[in-house]
């Protein structure tokens, strides 16, 4: 049975937005440094969209934002 992790992806996106803003980066700047499109970052951060991403991309984002990857994977109950 395949489980859909919509809420977890939403929380990851909100954390990406939080740490990106904390570092003073725009979505465009983060996208350029990670090697993805600004639209991809926008979709990740949108609270009403559950966009999946690979661990490689998550690790790249964590590296650019200087945040340990596990910070993105600690979830609150919905």
Where are these regions (language model features)?
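Short, basic-rich loop-to-helix N-cap that marks the start of a DNA-contacting helix
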Residues: 48-63
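Short C-terminal boundary/hinge segments that cap the last helix of small helical domains
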Residues: 66-78
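Short basic helix-loop element that most often maps to the first helix and adjoining turn
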Residues: 14-33
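Helix-turn-helix DNA-binding elements, focusing on the entry/boundary residues of the two helices
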Residues: 16, 27, 38, 55-58
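Conserved hydrophobic/aromatic packing and binding residues within compact polymer-binding modules
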Residues: 16, 30-31, 41-44, 72
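A detector for short, charged/polar N-terminal pre-domain segments
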Residues: 1-11
């Amino acid at each position: 049975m395949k489980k859909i992790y919509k809420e977890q992806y939403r929380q990851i996106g909100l954390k990406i937005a939080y740490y990106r803003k904390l570092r003073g980066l725009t979505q465009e700047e983060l996208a350029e440094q990670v090697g993805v499109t600004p639209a991809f970052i926008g979709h990740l951060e949108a609270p009403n969209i559950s966009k999946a991403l690979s661990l490689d991309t998550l690790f790249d984002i964590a590296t650019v934002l200087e945040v340990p990857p596990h910070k993105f994977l600690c979830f609150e109950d919905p």
